[in-house]
Regions:
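RNase H-like, Mg2+-dependent phosphodiesterase core
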Residues: 1-70, 77-277
């Protein structure tokens, strides 16, 4: 068997007989490929073990007769500009999504890849875009609680249990369980964190094309030095949170709205599955 054929074989699922044959092959190229193959298997086994641990909360509820468990997380509580995005995700009981983790621990490219896989595999997904107006009206904590309750009530498949990243929430006809660092401990919450983060990043990238002076594509609405300088020079857009300092103290008139805005800073929006800027 040629080395190229061995490589192709080991990319698949070789039989035990084929592996024995390759182990007896003294060619260094074959042995290197075998070593790489076993390392890959070990890495895959470790990832499956890690993912299984991330399903511990969900499996405990399923073992007690619960039919559906949702995970809930948000993106955008801290920025000076842009909406708050909240996502709820129900994963299949037998789900396996390699690399799933807290969105903050992942690169943008990895989040985008996982976003697509979550969309493809999830039982149900709901996204709630909480408006800047409601953030300013209710304060960010209350707006988050309110938005999380709403995203659960709008889920097309209703869960009996909702696992929520650190936030105490009350929603109709379900048990809501806050979990500190839940996005690193629960697969469902981690999936929700990725959906929320990718969705919000795409919104901010869209807003960057409409308000290019503020660097939204890069700062995602956080108060970087360049962002603060732009506010001082050009004023605050209607996407800036007037209840957040230092914008609150600046008392600036809003920049004129763009004619082709895709989202509203005054109205909450609900989306099932995905939002593409």
């Amino acid at each position: 068997m040629k080395i190229s054929e061995v490589k192709e074989l080991l990319l698949g699922n070789p039989s035990s007989e084929q592996l024995k044959m390759l182990q007896a092959d003294e060619r260094s190229g074959v042995q290197k490929l075998l070593t790489a193959y076993y390392k890959r298997l070990e890495k895959e086994a470790q990832e499956k073990e890690r993912f299984t641990k991330m399903l511990a909360y969900e499996r405990e509820y399923y073992a007690h007769g619960v039919q559906y468990v949702a995970g809930v997380d948000e993106a955008g509580r801290g920025p000076l500009a842009g909406p708050l995005v909240i996502a709820a995700v129900i994963l299949p009981r037998n789900a396996f999504i390699a690399g799933l983790n807290d969105s903050k621990q992942l690169s943008a490219a990895k989040r985008d890849k996982l976003y697509d896989e979550i969309i493809a595999k999830a039982v149900a997904i709901e996204v709630n875009i909480v408006s800047v107006s409601n953030i300013d009206k209710y304060n960010i904590y209350a707006a988050t609680q309110r938005g999380m309750a709403q995203v659960l009530e709008h889920l097309p498949v209703q869960p009996q249990v909702a696992l929520i990243d650190a936030m105490p929430v009350t929603a109709k006809n379900m048990e809501c369980v806050p979990i500190v660092h839940g996005d690193a401990l629960s697969a469902s919450i981690a999936a929700a964190s990725i959906i929320a983060k990718v969705t919000r990043d795409r919104i901010m990238e869209r807003l960057d094309t409409l308000f290019p002076d503020y660097g939204f594509a890069h700062n995602k609405g956080y108060g970087s030095g360049a962002h603060m300088q732009a506010i001082a020079e050009f004023g605050a857009t209607k996407w800036h949170r007037r209840s957040y300092e230092p914008v609150k103290s600046m008392q600036l008139e809003p920049v004129a709205a763009a004619d082709n805005e895709l989202y509203s800073p005054q109205l909450d929006c609900h989306y099932v599955f995905s939002i593409d800027a």
